[in-house]
Amino acid sequence: MSKKSNKSLAFSLLGLIVSMVLLSFAAVPLYNLFCKVTGYGGTTNRETVSIYSKVKGTRPIIIEFDANVDKNLPWRFIPRQQRVQIVPGQNTLVFYETENLSDNDIIGTSIYNVTPNKAGKYFVKIHCFCFEEQLLKAGEKVLMPVTFYIDKDFENDPEMRDVKVLTLSYSFFKVRDVKK
């Protein structure tokens, strides 16, 4: 190989590495955008004001809560309640507890989904920590609220007849350390 082709190969490989690093930083925001646009993976609806606050269904549904943390993020993240039983149209407030176990301030972000996936379109979030980056100072512990309801149309959808339990699952990922 000539020096020119070696140099060309080196620049190509360097460009590939830089592209991969940039894509890894963009992966979580791009995934969130993809899920919001397509509804993929049990992505929920989001509202600022509940239109169903006075309209309640009759069919009880159990909502279970799940929490996961990426291995690169030294946080403890757990739901304060393992499950709640609600009816469609009932506004519900739950909390997740998050603690930074490191000696550094860290910014993290979460993604979420609802299973079974077919029920995600009926899960309406009113307020959630998942739409913003979260800064936790070293050793800090915080409660993160989620307000939601199940759309009343859930009861009328024949595909939802077999659904008795929904799971709201969050996964936190590290965005970056904060320089002191």
UniProtKB/Swiss-Prot annotation:
Periplasmic-facing ranges: 30-180
Gene Ontology MF terms: copper ion binding
Gene3D superfamilies: Ctag/Cox11
SUPFAM superfamilies: Ctag/Cox11
Gene Ontology CC: plasma membrane
Origin superkingdom: Bacteria
Transmembrane segments: 9-29
Function of the molecule: Exerts its effect at some terminal stage of cytochrome c oxidase synthesis, probably by being involved in the insertion of the copper B into subunit I.
Protein's UniProt name: Cytochrome c oxidase assembly protein CtaG
Organism listed in the record: Rickettsia bellii (strain RML369-C)
